[in-house]
Amino acid sequence: MRQTYSFKKDFAGKTLKIDIGKVAWQATGAALVQYGETTVLVTVVASEEKKEDVDFFPLTVEYVERLYAAGKIPGGFFKREGKPTEPEILFARLIDRPLRPLFSKDFRNEVQVIVTVLSYDHENSTDIPSIIGASCAIMLAGLPFKGPIGAVRVGWDGKEWYINPSVALSNSLLLDLVVAGTKDAVLMIEGDGKEVPEEIFLEGIIRAHEQIGEVINFQEEILSMVNPVPFNYEPFVVNENLKKDVLEYVTVDQIRDAIFTPSKSERQKALEDLKKRVIEHFKPIYGEITAQIDEIINQEAKAILTKVILEEKRRVDGRRLNELRPVSCEVGVLSRVHGSALFQRGETQVLSVVTLGAGEEQIIESVIESEPKRYIHHYNFPPFSVGEAKPLRGPKRREIGHGALAERALLPLIPKEEEFPYTIRVVSEVLSSNGSTSMASVCGSSLSLMDAGVPIKTHVAGVAMGLIKEGEKFEVLTDIQGLEDALGGMDFKIAGTKNGITAVQLDIKVDGLSYEIIEKTLKQAKEARYQILDIMEKTISQPRPEISPYAPRIMVLEINPNKIGDLIGPSGKNIKKIIEETHTTINIKPEGLVYISAPDQESAEKAAQMVQEYTRDIKEGDIFLGKVIRVTDYGAFVEILPGKIGLLHISKYKTTGTGKNQTREEINLGDEILIKVDSIDPSGRISLSRKDL
């Protein structure tokens, strides 16, 4: 009989329940986590053998939503879940970030964490129980992990603070943050704000971290009861004799000269040539040593970089610690597109292109409800941007993650549909990469949106901040490039306007960040952001007054919702007629808003006129130019508006003369005649008259 455990705790006013040993017996570790009525199963499987010849920890995190969790049946022909959706990829990346830095550096066994969403209560998001469950499952597996960790969502509405707010409330808050960490330090931050000041952001991080200790204590209680067996693994250890021989064969000055080469491509070549020379020299003696040499050279390069930055306050390209690389901007770089911009920062170069469309919102299929997306940002990272030749096989997880981050950074500035009724797609093409491409795409997006005439009130800029740390000594680096990201301790991406922060994302390689480091980073990033925004404003300071002549024209009309049926007509007859005659696309909202998208202004105006005719209220005394569509013995039926027909009784015909000489006018099929609405009965039947006209 298997031993099962069930633990409960009140956490931010809701019940957090973790079941151990109930399901997934074959996994190395598993936890069934329920928060409110949202339930996730988190499993961890570790391979028994270490992965040879890799210089990284092979961790994979998968997040899988089963739509039955929210009582939904998947769309599409096959009616089953397929490849990971964008929300699933973003959640997987969110869960991965606080876990990865806490695994032992000598652990090279493959580890797969799978989070499966089993139940969703439409109130509690799945991210917080997923991170807590992943921490618990890893600890139960006995893996070499410096946990447990906790995670909390914190929100602010301008007055009140909320811990683990509901999904609906989170969507309406000025600040929405997910923070993960240990008892002593912060490991991961991800969130967005509506131009929130740095001080409020920091307060939110601190408030969240104060709650994390509760969750960690709860997990420690679970671990003390379950008492997991430590995972037995063969550690990755650098051969000390090889290390001694390498550092005698290669001098510190040679490594230093390689990493302090100004150009990225030249620096990479210098380091690769150095490693290649060392491998060729020692391979006959030690055998396959590629991973070992990578580790030795990288650790030595990191030590040199750390020493120079902490002691000399100097970076590999000669910049000061808080200095930006040279920034340049250009807008209107492509002629036929709706908006474009080229943003360059050092050797990082991004082309952002805007396309305006009508009624083409993106619908996301997920257990968590979301509004159709009117603003979409896609980020492409082709291999040529880093001087590589690789096959193109669609966007990778990193590209999806970076695209979503830049999207969130601009979203608070995107005008409401009532103000600007277009669907907006921005594509950022990375043309050259030397670090901080996601933040460059934020800047490029902002510039291209203004170039396209999208009425955003101000620019948004982003900057990536780095960290060099040794013991208690640390320095924060502004606008990190590739090497400083690879060898440094953090990549803290911060985007915003001059009014405040709109999006953040923190990745770290150290064991956590103190409040002091976070505060210094936010302050330094603000200074850099202001400098970038000043440069962007000199290029284009406000949106162009007109959209591109190549963009579709959209008109918005408001009609009485009760008239929607009149506009559509029987079997869609009326709306089809408008679309066919004007070559437009028409989208009708239930509240009575009619969106007309046309290739040119003339077509849009013609369609608008027809919509108004179909939905116009007819009143007694109104005069129309109508068309006779049927003639009978007792009168004529006249169409006064599309689909609106009245009876002109013979007694209401126009007459001439008097007495015996009085004659009634002759009306024939197809005649166009001026006519007046005489009366409308309670059932809506219209009586017409030609008298007195």
Curated annotation (Swiss-Prot):
Enzyme class: transferase
Coiled-coil segments: none
Keyword Disulfide bond: no
Predominant place of localization: cytoplasm
GO cellular component terms, A-Z: cytosol
CDD domains in the cross-refs: KH-I_PNPase, RNase_PH_PNPase_1, RNase_PH_PNPase_2
Cofactor (UniProt): Mg(2+)
EC numbers on record: 2.7.7.8
Gene3D superfamilies in the record: GHMP Kinase, N-terminal domain, K Homology domain, type 1, Nucleic acid-binding proteins
Record-listed Mg(2+) binding positions: 485, 491
Highest taxon above the source species: Bacteria
UniProt-listed GO biological process terms: mRNA catabolic process; RNA catabolic process; RNA processing
Substrates-to-products reaction catalysed: RNA(n+1) + phosphate = RNA(n) + a ribonucleoside 5'-diphosphate
GO molecular function: 3'-5'-RNA exonuclease activity; magnesium ion binding; polyribonucleotide nucleotidyltransferase activity; RNA binding
Function: Involved in mRNA degradation. Catalyzes the phosphorolysis of single-stranded polyribonucleotides processively in the 3'- to 5'-direction.
Similarity field: Belongs to the polyribonucleotide nucleotidyltransferase family.
Protein name per Swiss-Prot or TrEMBL: Polyribonucleotide nucleotidyltransferase
Higher taxonomy: Bacteria, Pseudomonadati, Dictyoglomota, Dictyoglomia, Dictyoglomales
Gene that produces this protein: pnp
